[in-house]
Amino acid sequence: MRNFADRLTEAIAAKNNPTVMGLDPKLEYIPDSIIEKANALFDDPARSTAEAILMFNKGLIDAVSDIVPAVKPQSAFYELYGLEGMRALDATIEYAQSKGLLVILDAKRNDIGNTAQAYAAGLLGKTQIADGSFVSMTGADAVTVNGYLGKDGIAPFVEVSKEEGTGIFCLVRTSNPSAGDLQDLKLEDGRQVYQAMADLVNEWGGELIGESGFSSVGAVVGATWPEQAVEARKRMPHALILVPGYGAQGAGPDAAVASFTADGKGSIVNASRSLMCAWKSREGKTREDFMACTREEAIDMRDKLNAALADRKYV
């Protein structure tokens, strides 16, 4: 398969939209009509719950598949429901890709040695099964990883990405309020921890730079810290950057585009709750109106990001 960075860059350009929609389902987000339909299909509550999640996700995907280039399911919201939840995740990935969307699995995995190899093969590559063949188990186009175990925890993901045309996004400067507890600490050489991680990501991604000029070894840099995002981009000129923190976490479009390159490329901004629950911000709308509201919000987000790129506040 082609280089992941090239595929994502082309998809963003084709839709003129640097947005990835997060798929982090909760039962409270799902319309009653969907839950009732799922309950009518299955007697097993666990199975009907997973079916409701899948129906909801399909509705969200149908609403925006011609607008956004990618979706980002957060694994925890499916693991929460055990085996049935993981089946819903698998079906969500397959459905999104059937609609022409790239899938970034937000799993934040990492370990060392054989465990890292197993994660990499299971999430991004192929796994050998009993008949001797190798098959793709998860099928995601990319996965988020935690690079704070160092190179030996990342190397298996890089190798699989090189072989399979998949990609990774390493945590560099996260969007959560307490991120600075560790990531802003200063090292003996004067760099902050997140800066050192950015330098490592730049090093790890050198062999996976595609024709687009971007590497399939990307980074996660939150929109909630725009000044650090500008600094991170300087240290990672070739990295694709996944930008959480827009919308429900408080960051606006100006901060969200801080990590983009000078020509407005190289980053993709995530929105989860603000898209999934867009009906909440529209007067007179209910959960039953989620598809139309999500589509409206996705178009509005696209236009705001593009306007912010045309008039940069953080450079």
Whereabouts are the PLM-identified features?
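N-terminal glycine-rich anion-binding loop in soluble enzyme alpha/beta folds
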Residues: 2-65, 285
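Short, well-ordered coil/turn segments that N-cap beta-strands
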Residues: 15-19, 66-69, 99-101, 138-141, ...
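Conserved, mostly hydrophobic/aromatic
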Residues: 21, 71, 106, 143, ...
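A C-terminal functional module that forms or caps the active site or interfaces directly
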Residues: 54, 219, 223-270, 274-278
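Acidic (Asp/Glu)-rich catalytic clusters
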Residues: 61-68, 95-98, 158-163, 233-236, ...
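N-terminal active-site wall of soluble small-molecule enzyme domains
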Residues: 67-69, 73-132, 136, 225-228
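Conserved anion-binding
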Residues: 111-217
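C-terminal helical cap(s) of enzyme catalytic domains, especially alpha/beta-barrels
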Residues: 256-262, 277-315
